[in-house]
């Protein structure tokens, strides 16, 4: 599991995750992800290169969203593939965290 950070316009931070977001992957990215969560308030999490999403990974995303929301910020999930999107829907995550298919749609949520 790889994690990369890009700064977008309007103070938006894009976190790009790549690989299997299984338990091992979640453990690898949890600390750097939590550091980003504590420092930034508008975050797009790009899951387009994530091939698998485990329950521990869902927890990492949910906890991050709750922390950001508690500080008045927002987190949006970007471009999950069909399998990952299905897992998010099944877990009810799409009702808790906005999920968008394009970067422009994701950034629009964060700037509204």
Model-identified regions with their sequence ranges:
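STAS-typified acidic loop motif
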Residues: 2-31, 48-49
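General small-molecule cofactor/ligand-binding pocket signal
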Residues: 4-6, 78, 100
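Residue-level detector of intrinsically disordered, flexible termini
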Residues: 8-9, 90, 94, 104-105
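Amphipathic alpha-helical interaction surfaces in cytosolic regulatory modules
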Residues: 23-97
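A charged, well-structured terminal subsegment
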Residues: 98-112
């Amino acid at each position: 599991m790889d994690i990369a950070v890009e700064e977008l316009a309007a103070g938006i931070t894009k976190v790009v995750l790549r690989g299997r977001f299984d338990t091992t992957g979640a453990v690898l990215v949890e600390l750097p992800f939590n550091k980003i969560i504590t420092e930034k308030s508008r975050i797009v999490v790009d899951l387009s290169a994530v091939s698998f999403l485990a329950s521990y990974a869902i927890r990492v995303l949910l906890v991050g969203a709750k922390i950001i929301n508690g500080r008045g910020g927002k987190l949006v999930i970007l471009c999950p593939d069909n399998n990952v999107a299905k897992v998010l829907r099944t877990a009810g995550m799409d009702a808790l965290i906005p999920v968008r298919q394009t970067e422009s749609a994701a950034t629009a949520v964060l700037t509204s």
